[in-house]
Amino acid sequence: MKSGFSNTYFYYPLPDYKLPLHIYSDKHLPKDAKGWKPYYVPDSSTLIADESKLYEDIIKNNVFEFFANSFLVECSIDSREMGEIEFAILHSDRQEKYRVGTTINKKKEVHCIPLNSASKEHLLHLYENSLKMVGRGLNIVPLKLQGDKLEMSFMGYPTMEELILDAYRNKEINKIEELFDTLLKQIEMGAIEAKKENNILYELNIDKGDSKIFYGKILKTAYIDMLPRNCFMKDGLLFWFDQEWKLENIPSKYILYRAIHFLYMENPWIDEVLERRELIKRYNIQDCEESFYTLEVMFYSSVVVDKNTFFAKNTFGNGGLKEQLTNLLNFFDKRNGGK
C-alpha cells in the first residue's frame, strides 16, 4: 500500500512566508542574493549568524532549497497540473498605494498586478510612463493593459546589469565604461532640458540656487528607474521595463548615480576591479554625490516607509532632513495626482 502525495511542487518565499517579497520555485531558483532582504535587526550583535552574508554562498553551492527560511507546497495525488506560477516579486514593503507585484507563469507570461485597490493608479502610471518613453525614441518591452493588470512579453535576453557584471568578472574596464556611457545616453535620449534654476535639488532645499556645484543636464521629465537591472539588451539595443517612477527637473547624472550606487552596494567585490570613486569621477559626480545621496534617501523613504513611522524612528537624526522629506512627500504626491 502506498501513502503520501505522488506530486509536489515547492515554493520558497523570501525573507519568509509571513511577509514575502520574492517567491521562488523549483523551476525558478535564485541566481544571486539580490532577492534577499532580511528583516531589520536593531542590534546585529544579537544574531547567531547574519543571513545576508551567507546567502550568496548558499546559492552558489546549490543548497538554497535546504536553507530557505520557509517553503510552501502544492500537493496532489491525481494531478500534475501544478506550478502555474514560477516566480513572483511582491512590493509589499511599500506604502499601500505603491504596492504592485510581478509574476511569471509556466507559459512564460509576465503579469504586473496591483496588490490592493489603492495601487491600481500606480500601475496605470507605470503603463503611461512606458508609452511616453517610446515617444522619446526609447525601446520598451512590449506590454498591454488588460483590465487591472499589465501583460508584458517575456524576453529571454540578458539584462544590462548582467552584461556589466560579466565585464567586471573579465576585468574589461573599457567595456564597463562603454556600457555606462550607453546608459547615460539612454537616460538623456529625447528628453527636454529644463532651466538650471528649476533643479529639483533647489526646490527641495537640498542645495541652494546659488550653489557652485555643476549638476549637468536637468531633465524636464525623467524616469529614475532607468537602471541596468531594468532593461534587456538584444543586438546592442536596450529594451526597458518596470519604469514606475517619473519625476521632473531631475539631473540626468542623478539617475546614473543611482545605477552606480546600487551596483556597488549589492556587488561589493566589483570595487576591486574598478573602484567606485573612479567611476564617480569619470562622470563628474563627486561634487554632486552628497546631494544625490540625500535625494535618494528621501525618495526611498517616501515610497517604502510610512512618513509617520519614518519620523518617529528619527532615521536621519536631524530636523533639516525631516523638513526636506516633508517637501519631497508633498512634491511627489502632486506629481502623482495627489493634493
Annotate each language-model stretch with its function.
Residues M1-Y12:
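Short alpha-helix
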Residues Y12-H91, T326, N330-D333, G337:
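A C-terminal cap/extension of S-adenosyl-L-methionine-dependent methyltransferases
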Residues P13-K18, D78-R80, N116-A118, Q146-K149, ...:
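Short, solvent-exposed loop/turn segments at secondary-structure junctions
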Residues H91-L131:
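ATP-binding glycine-rich loop module of kinase domains
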Residues I140-D207:
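Conserved structural core of kinase catalytic domains
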Residues L204, I250-G338:
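Helical subdomain adjoining the active site within ATP-dependent kinase catalytic cores
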Residues L204-E272:
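Catalytic activation segment of kinase domains across protein kinase-like and atypical kinase folds
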